[in-house]
Each structure stands twice: as C-alpha cells, then as structure tokens.
Amino acid sequence: MTIAIGKSSKEPKDLFDSMDDWLRRDRFVFVGWSGLLLFPCAYFALGGWFTGTTFVTSWYTHGLASSYLEGCNFLTAAVSTPANSLAHSLLLLWGPEAQGDFTRWCQLGGLWTFVALHGSFGLIGFMLRQFELARSVQLRPYNAIAFSGPISVFVSVSLIYPLGQAGWFFAPSFGVAAIFRFILFFQGFHNWTLNPFHMMGVAGVLGAALLCAIHGATVENTLFEDGDGANTFRAFNPTQSEETYSMVTANRFWSQIFGVAFSNKRWLHFFMLFVPVTGLWMSAIGVVGLALNLRAYDFVSQEIRAAEDPEFETFYTKNILLNEGIRAWMAAQDQPHENLVFPEEVLPRGNAL
C-alpha cells in the first residue's frame, strides 16, 4: 500500500500562499486576486466621475457648463473629453500638459482619461472576478463570457473609436445628455443607424429583451404548485429534487403558438446567452469600423437620382439630408477652433426661425 504524504501544515507559508489564503477566504464580499484590479480601479473611476460632474467645468475644452456647481442637473452634468488640440495624450497629472497642477489638469480634461482608463480596467477586473469565483466554486465561466459583451462595447466606443479619430475629443463624454449628443454625432457623421453591425446589435438587445420576457412569463405560467413537503420549493434549498416548472407544458404551449419550441433547457438558455452577447459583440465590431471611417450602405444611385429629380425621394435620401444638417450644425458648434463657416442657405433652421 502506498501512502501519500503531503507537506506538514506547520511549515511556514510563503508570501504568495499567505496572500492567496487571505484574498480567496470565504467572506460576505469575495475579494480574490481579481479584486486587486477591480476595487481600486472601480473606486477611482467612480470617484473621478463624481468629482468631475460635481465641480469641474468643460468651458476650456468644449465651451460648456457640465457640473452641478455651474447649474447642471443629473441629466446634463458630464465628465467631458479633453480638448481636440491634446489629440491622444494620456494627460497624466505629472505630464507635460498639466505639470502637476491639479486644477489645470481638470481644466484640460484629465479627469476623462482618468475615468475612461480606470473604468476600462475596472470592467475587465469585474469579468476576471466572475472567472475567478466560477473557478473557485466549480462553475463554468459563461457569466464572464457574457459580461465581455458590455466590456467590448465600452472599450470600442470610449477607447478604440477616438484612437482611430483625431483624438480623445471625439469620444463620448461621460454623462446622460452627453451620450445622447454622441449618438447624434454617430448618426450624422457615420450614418450609424444604417450600419449592418448596428442592426445586429439592435436585434441582439431587443431580441434578448423579448426572450427574457417570454422566458420569465413562461416559467411563471408553468410553475408547479408549492407542496408541504420538507424538500419542496423552500427558497434557496439546494437539495430540491423536483422541477420548479413544467418544461413539457411550456413546450406544448409554444409549439401550439409558433409551431416550434425549445425542447430542452440547455439549448434554450444557451440561446438566451447567445443573442444579446453576439449582438453586443457585433456592435463593438461596427464601432471599430467607424474608428477607421469605414462606410456601409451608401445607396449612391438613389442619391444621384434624388439630386436629378426633385420629385424622387426615399426614406434613405431624407435621412442623408438629415445627416448633412447634423454635420453642418454640430461641426461648427463642437469644433469652434476650426473656424468652420457655412453659407446661410445650407444651415438648418430651427422652428423659431
């Protein structure tokens, strides 16, 4: 008989083992090795955002008021992108732009790069946290894989897109109204709504919402009645042996409604994972394309015919004209340093004019 003898528990642990024991200890809020990245980055990203929206103006970078101190509210406050002249500078506090002056750093837009970079690493840390915890309790890593969807969208929009453009100036500022303005910018300058990758993203997000509503309603509709047994539906009892709802009944119901239905829970839940995550990934790929100024679905034949025949118009040609109006108005507003001057006859007029 062979006897396996392990290390004596009395042997002193090295630094790595001691840290591993402390970080991965069972506690109310799991820390883990991923927490070394997640918690500091999330703290600094949120702290920078709250600081910027509360105190810091965007007058020097965008000519705008953007803080509570200046009279903005939650919907209009934002941490704005750096000035266009700063291009892709990391805007480090100790760098050549701010030279250690915190006030100047905030005025130049340093808080935006601070929030964007720490926010990106914080999101990645959160995904790694899901990997680490899943491995610790012997789960498969699909939660982390699903979370890669939002991460890919955030990184592509906030980092990769401005890297492909002239500077951080063209990234979205971090605020509600600021994001809306960025969406209008995407439409006017890239015709984003007609981009097939955006279409796949919309199909993924709205399709996922539909699947979620259908699934939740179906489970509620087919729940088995609670029994009085000690082993029946007691909240989070891990030893429950019965099914919670009737998959057979659900299958028969949707087979009658649609003619087709999911026949097993594995495929059903994988599909609910696949639809939104793939949609988000496709959107992220599309934004990377926009970073390189790739265009999609330019129906030039319709534009030429519309230019030649005043009576010919499609929804596409109307949208193209709308995009031209967005560009004419936004470019002059957003980039006053470019001294863009458009003839009066091409500028869009508001209702008051």
From Swiss-Prot:
Family annotation (InterPro entries): D1/D2, Photo_II_D1/D2_sf, Photo_RC_L/M, Photo_RC_L/M_CS, PSII_PsbD/D2
Its EC number(s): 1.10.3.9
Chain sites annotated for binding Fe cation: 215, 269
EC category name: oxidoreductase
Subcellular location: Plastid, Chloroplast thylakoid membrane
Protein keywords: Acetylation, Chlorophyll, Chloroplast, Chromophore, Electron transport, Iron, Magnesium, Membrane, Metal-binding, Oxidoreductase, Phosphoprotein, Photosynthesis, Photosystem II, Plastid, Thylakoid, Transmembrane, Transmembrane helix, Transport
Keyword Plastid: yes
Cofactor binding: number and manner: The D1/D2 heterodimer binds P680, chlorophylls that are the primary electron donor of PSII, and subsequent electron acceptors. It shares a non-heme iron and each subunit binds pheophytin, quinone, additional chlorophylls, carotenoids and lipids. There is also a Cl(-1) ion associated with D1 and D2, which is required for oxygen evolution. The PSII complex binds additional chlorophylls, carotenoids and specific lipids.
Modified residues (Phosphothreonine): 2
One Gene Ontology molecular-function label: iron ion binding
Binding-site residues, chlorophyll a PD2: 198
Chain sites annotated for binding pheophytin a: 130, 143
GO BP terms in the entry: photosynthetic electron transport in photosystem II
Keyword Metal-binding appears in the UniProt entry: yes
Binding site for a plastoquinone: 215, 262
Other information: 2 of the reaction center chlorophylls (ChlD1 and ChlD2) are entirely coordinated by water.
Summary of subunit composition and partner proteins: PSII is composed of 1 copy each of membrane proteins PsbA, PsbB, PsbC, PsbD, PsbE, PsbF, PsbH, PsbI, PsbJ, PsbK, PsbL, PsbM, PsbT, PsbX, PsbY, PsbZ, Psb30/Ycf12, at least 3 peripheral proteins of the oxygen-evolving complex and a large number of cofactors. It forms dimeric complexes.
HAMAP family membership: PSII_PsbD_D2 (MF_01383)
Protein name stated in the entry: Photosystem II D2 protein
Species of provenance: Angiopteris evecta (Mule's foot fern)
Gene transcribed to yield this protein: psbD
